[in-house]
Structures are given as C-alpha cells and as structure tokens.
Amino acid sequence: MTALTHPSIPTTTSAVPHGLRLVGAGTRLWRVVDRAGRVVGHIQTSEEADALRFHALRYSARIRRFLEVGRFWSLDDAVSCLHYVR
C-alpha cells in the first residue's frame, strides 16, 4: 500500500474555510462537516497528470449515491464549492 503525502492533504481533523472542518473517512476521502456536526459533503483526492485533484462530492438520497459537483486543483476551492452548493 502506498501512502499519499502531499502538503495540501490534511492528515488529521483540519479547519478549512467557511467554518467547516475535515474529518478523515478513508485513505483519500474526507467528510466536510459544519459547525453543528452536519455532513456537508465529501472531498476525494486523485492523482492526474502528476498533479493532485480534489473532487467535491454530495450525497443524493433520491438516487442513493454520491454526485461529483466539481474537480479542483486546491482543497480550499473544493470545500468552498460544497459550502456554496448547499
């Protein structure tokens, strides 16, 4: 197993913009949680063309799966997307 290390990837619970925080949910997956503890969405990482991409995901109860709402070059942009999509 390879560990993904990158300066912009949080390794523990981290504070991010808009009063949200990240909680680890897997090797390349974080829950984005608001101040009240509600899950706003998820951030998933992938490596594409020697660069790291951040995928903003929202769960749709109607179709019972995650939908990608955007791909970003920065973690802050992905979190901002989830903040404004709610």
Spans of model-derived segments:
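A broad, structure-centric signal for solvent-exposed, well-ordered loop/edge residues
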Residues: 8, 29, 39, 50, ...
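Negatively charged, low-complexity tracts enriched in Asp/Glu with abundant Ser/Thr
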Residues: 1-35, 62-69
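Short aromatic-glycine-(Arg/Gly/Cys) micro-motifs in beta-strand/loop hairpins
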Residues: 40-65
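Functionally constrained cores in energy, signaling, and assembly domains
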Residues: 31, 42-45, 86
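Intrinsic-disorder/low-complexity peptide segments enriched for small residues
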Residues: 2, 18-20, 50, 55, ...
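A short, charged, amphipathic alpha-helix used as a generic interaction element across diverse proteins
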Residues: 59-65, 70-86
